[in-house]
Amino acid sequence: ITGVVLVRNEQYHLQKPFIEQVIFKYYPSSAAAFDAFHAGEVAGISQVTKDILPQALAEPNLSIYTNRLPQMGFVLLNLNNPEVPFLQETKLRRALMLGLNRQRLIDAFMQGQAIPLDGPILPGSWAHYEGVEKIPYDADMAIALLKELGYTLPADGGAVRVNKDGKPLAFSLVHPDDAVHTQMAQSIQANWAAIGVQVNLISVPYASLQNDYLAKRAYQAALVELALPRTPDPDPYPFWHQAEATGLAQNYSQWDNRPASEYLEQARVTTDFGLRARLYRNFQVIFARELPSLPLYVSVYTYGVNVTVQG
């Protein structure tokens, strides 16, 4: 199949549509689709991927639009792994968040095709709370928090902070083995090294990350993208409710917070739209305070339409 043609229904009982037909043409790649646009064969490109983005932005006859994808980048932290008990410390998780340069991840490795994420509900959703705390990149503040927690640099001049018992502040970060996620993981590793935290990287195929690490809770930290249902209802219950922390459920961080779970439970059953929004707001406030995992970015979807197309 190389395309689909939709024609106007002349028997439609209301006003006749103004457009006589719409033609969808299929191409083997985004580059081929862009060439077709340049040749005047099509009036738009359904997806402007990163490889053709520079050319698309430079094309004067192509208007570029973006929208958020229901896909969120996170560093998941395993809060119930006895190998890394320090991840249970809220202030330490906050220090890790402060030490993350999320904008660099977006600019350097995603060509700007994402926006920073500050919580577990997509920006733009009716359930998103705009007033949620937005934690900046502040390495100095991160270091101050670590010092407050008793993590200091060793007297011999080492670069990794240790606690009062001399144990290093170190953990592993498992990540997908594709080029983009590998570069992101290396950038995160460098960010945290700058505040005295040692991160050992583990590169695996995404299927292995899901099945061998997340599902089995056999990890310390993981760089992931959480895919949400393509519906107007955000329902963060599967990823963050305490009942989903074990078995094959998806609360991979094993976050066990009863007040947050109660808000999610109530939001699932009430039909009062305003009440649901307030319940999700309260949930997001707790999430921002506790930071059971570290939100990074929301991917965006980019497409292009000929400037002559109206409406």
Regions found by a protein language model. Give the residues of each.
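Bilobed "Venus flytrap"/periplasmic-binding protein-like clamshell domains
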Residues: I1-H13, P28, Q103, A139-I143, ...
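Short, well-ordered beta-strand elements
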Residues: G3-V5, E20-Y26, G44, P168-D177, ...
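Ligand-site clamp/hinge motif
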Residues: N9-Q55, Q189, G196-N200
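Immediate post-signal peptide segment of exported/extracytoplasmic ligand-binding proteins
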Residues: K16-E20, T90, P136-S172
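Short helices/loops that flank or line small-molecule/ion binding pockets
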Residues: A31-E41, A58-E59, K91, Q186-I195, ...
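A ligand-binding cleft/hinge motif common to bilobed small-molecule-binding domains
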Residues: V48-E59, L228-D233
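Detector for C-terminal structural segments
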Residues: T66-R68, M72-G73, G99-E133, D138-M141, ...
